Amino acid sequence: MLWLALGPFRAMENQVLVIRIKIPNSGAVDWTVHSGPQLLFRDVLDVIGQVLPEATTTAFEYEDEDGDRITVRSDEEMKAMLSYYYSTVMEQQVNGQLIEPLQIFPRACKPPGERNIHGLKVNTRAGPSQHTSPVVSDSLPSNSLKKSSAELRKILANGQMNEQDIRYRDTLGHGNGGTVYKAYHVPSGKILAVKVILLDITLELQKQIMSELEILYKCDSSYIIGFYGAFFVENRISICTEFMDGGSLDVYRKIPEHVLGRIAVAVVKGLTYLWSLKILHRDVKPSNMLVNTSGQVKLCDFGVSTQLVNSIAKTYVGTNAYMAPERISGEQYGIHSDVWSLGISFMELALGRFPYPQIQKNQGSLMPLQLLQCIVDEDSPVLPLGEFSEPFVHFITQCMRKQPKERPAPEELMGHPFIVQFNDGNATVVSMWVCRALEERRSQQGPP
């Protein structure tokens, strides 16, 4: 059996190993190891001890190809586990599959108490048997777990995401101020989306933007896109986020109301979450609403960084067609301005066209200010009642009131009959619609 183990071990000598330590009832912690084949049983127990300091752990388990749990209590059993895992990784690489972390399950552990261990990352570059300490790893943070502010500083200081670890694949789209790519993160084996924005700003402003982006690590909502990190290379900022295989809503045609209702619920919940953190989105529009084939709906590109918002505005001159009248007029911006943008976005998604026919959005949503003056001067557009339900028409009408204070507050949005009607957790409706739309798009494009 020894010669069988040598092949995978030698092949994986320079490969980063990510061990996912499963915590009972509390999620998981990822541990990145740069000397995987030399890893000893005691090394793993030491790290488990850091993750679960209140428990006594003498062994751990992993799952084989049949899903059976195999116990590891010694270096010999540790080598057998690594050999099995590396063989699996080599098969995944040959088949072009994504590499999954090695999952282990600590044994004889008491559940951890209320401690701030969520999102802990451990990174060891040391040789075997050397004790490790919790520092930031190269693996992607789990966007379902919150991070402490101390860890955030480590993440940004250690450059968790960097260009050398990213392989760009396809161009997903060109937004206002940047290009979005589908990319592969080598250390973790994850697919992600990377938005690259060219900015003519000073090094000091770059540092301020990175500091402001820290709050994205604290976002813990299933309706907000997962944020993995950001970095500057010269005058380009790259923002790395979760990849959504359905893309943004601006590329879809007219959306049926029963689908749009479920999407609206998710968007309102996402906005309400941001507002609870005192974050204004500032750029609510269909291209910043993402969907996937699982039926999830998530918001992206919200204005957590004032400096980034201002820098993009200075670099890319124009006015957003989804802006509320008070923003176009240069007045104060608030939650109610986001609500207007919510209303005009869903009106467009329902109609299949921009609600103001005199405004042509063929060249994107940025345009000269004078073209948008009609939004300030004219009455708000209204949906035809015979074509849509009364609750939906009322929802849009309320969101698009010209006076900001007359628009619904966050709690009023969640309690609106249109939102209540579709707040049933039925992701299957959105999933089926996304899958069908993607299939139609592929059939129209024909074979490559």
From Swiss-Prot:
PROSITE patterns: PB1, PROTEIN_KINASE_ATP, PROTEIN_KINASE_DOM, PROTEIN_KINASE_ST. The active site is at D283. ATP binds at L172, G173, H174, G175, N176, G177, G178, T179, V180, K195. This is Dual specificity mitogen-activated protein kinase kinase 5. It comes from Rattus norvegicus. It is an enzyme of class 2 (transferase). InterPro entries: Dual_spec_MAPK_kinase (IPR052468), Kinase-like_dom_sf (IPR011009), PB1-like (IPR053793), PB1_dom (IPR000270), PB1_MAP2K5 (IPR034851), Prot_kinase_dom (IPR000719), Protein_kinase_ATP_BS (IPR017441), Ser/Thr_kinase_AS (IPR008271). Interacts with PARD6A, MAP3K3 and MAPK7. Forms a complex with SQSTM1 and PRKCZ or PRKCI. Residues 126-144 have a biased composition (Polar residues). Acts as a scaffold for the formation of a ternary MAP3K2/MAP3K3-MAP3K5-MAPK7 signaling complex. Activation of this pathway appears to play a critical role in protecting cells from stress-induced apoptosis, neuronal survival and cardiac development and angiogenesis. As part of the MAPK/ERK signaling pathway, acts as a negative regulator of apoptosis in cardiomyocytes via promotion of STUB1/CHIP-mediated ubiquitination and degradation of ICER-type isoforms of CREM. The modification Phosphothreonine is found at T315. It catalyses: L-seryl-[protein] + ATP = O-phospho-L-seryl-[protein] + ADP + H(+); L-threonyl-[protein] + ATP = O-phospho-L-threonyl-[protein] + ADP + H(+); L-tyrosyl-[protein] + ATP = O-phospho-L-tyrosyl-[protein] + ADP + H(+). The gene is Map2k5. It holds the Pfam family Pkinase. Residues 116-144 are annotated as: Disordered. One of its GO terms (molecular function) is MAP kinase activity. Activated by phosphorylation on Ser/Thr by MAP kinase kinase kinases. Binds MAP3K2/MAP3K3 and MAPK7 via non-overlapping residues of the PB1 domain. This domain also mediates interactions with SQSTM1 and PARD6A. Residues 166-419 form the Protein kinase domain. The keyword Nucleotidyltransferase does not apply. GO terms for cellular component: cytosol; membrane; spindle.
